[in-house]
Regions:
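Residue-level signal for short, function-critical loop segments
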Residues: 69, 82, 230-232
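Short beta-strand element of the alpha/beta-hydrolase
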Residues: 73-82
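C-terminal catalytic histidine-bearing segment of alpha/beta-hydrolase fold enzymes
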Residues: 237, 241-244, 248-290
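Alpha/beta-hydrolase
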Residues: 79, 183, 259-262
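N-terminal cap/lid segment of alpha/beta-hydrolase-fold proteins
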Residues: 15-71
């Protein structure tokens, strides 16, 4: 292998597709994904949500907001996964209760899925959501100076790209995002170009490079948490390690954590476990700024 050649560049298509298929490491994929919906349905009956708030220019640009009973609370903005093709904000309400009980408001956002939208459009939608939330803070009582992103899987990719946006182009502070947690993400999306995953995404190598946060890393004020499950493919683990390495090389702060016993699909539930180191890191990150 040459110095510049990456592991995925020498993989067969079969191996590449297995490495970028998180379900290859679990036997109960459908059950785990269904639990997002069932747990979210339970939470939506317990908590009051401001539902289907339009943040952008299309009817699909909506978000749900659950407010903590605290003046000027921090706000966590969650971006769901699903390989840019599946799931919705409604499937990701389940973390809200723990955050709200801790004095942190919670938001779950929708974005238009592939093939109806290209990834670059999804990134712009996530940016618009943050822009709207920043400008709407006084209407809902959270603090626009305490915005935090959390993304899972494809949502981690979108969260990273959103964090790294040139916010001055949107007339917003460069440090609008105070902290970001990335769970089981893909930060160099070139490997998926050759796989079945790309069929609805329609990416080529040049576009994939342009839309990869790995190649956008710069000096940044946000505190970063990068995590993945023990039971994930080597490529998902490598992607997280390489992104954090580049992040730190730019002089930025970060925490890197593999969660023992977890996989790509159940790691998100660690945000709600009181004795979990990931939850402690996230809460500590938020409270340090707040």
């Amino acid at each position: 292998m040459s110095e510049k050649e990456l592991p995925w560049e020498r993989m067969s298509i079969e191996t590449l597709e297995r490495e970028y298929s998180p379900s290859s490491c679990v036997t109960n994929y459908e059950e785990l994904v269904h639990s997002y919906t069932s747990e979210s349905n339970k939470i939506s009956k317990i908590l009051k949500f401001e539902k289907d708030l339009i943040y952008g220019i299309s009817s699909e640009e909506k978000l749900d907001l659950c407010l903590a009973d605290v003046d000027d609370s921090p706000l966590v903005i969650f971006i769901h996964g699903g390989y840019w093709q599946l799931l919705s904000k409604d499937d990701c309400l389940f973390p809200a209760k723990d955050f709200v009980d801790t004095g942190i408001s919670y938001c779950s956002i929708d974005y238009t899925l592939a093939p109806r939208a290209h990834i670059n459009e999804m990134i712009e939608q996530c940016i618009r959501a943050v822009q709207w939330l920043y400008q709407s803070a006084s209407n809902y009582g959270y603090d626009e100076k305490k915005l935090f992103l959390i993304g899972s899987s494809a949502g981690a990719h979108l969260a990273a790209m959103t964090m790294l946006a040139d916010w001055k182009n949107y007339d917003l502070p460069a440090d609008i995002i105070k902290g970001c947690t990335l769970l089981s993400g893909v930060y160099d999306i070139r490997p998926i170009v050759k796989t079945y995953i790309n069929e609805p995404l329609n990416l080529d190598m040049q576009t994939a490079s342009m839309l990869s946060p790995l190649f956008k890393v710069k000096q940044h004020a946000a505190d970063l948490i990068i995590s993945w499950g023990e039971n994930e493919t080597d490529e998902f683990k490598r992607q997280s390690i390489e992104f954090e390495k580049k992040w730190k090389a730019c002089g930025n702060t970060s925490n890197l954590m593999e969660i023992k016993g977890n996989n790509h699909f159940d790691i998100v539930f660690n945000m709600m476990k009181k004795d979990c180191a990931l939850r402690e890191l996230i809460i500590e990150q938020i409270m340090r700024v707040s």
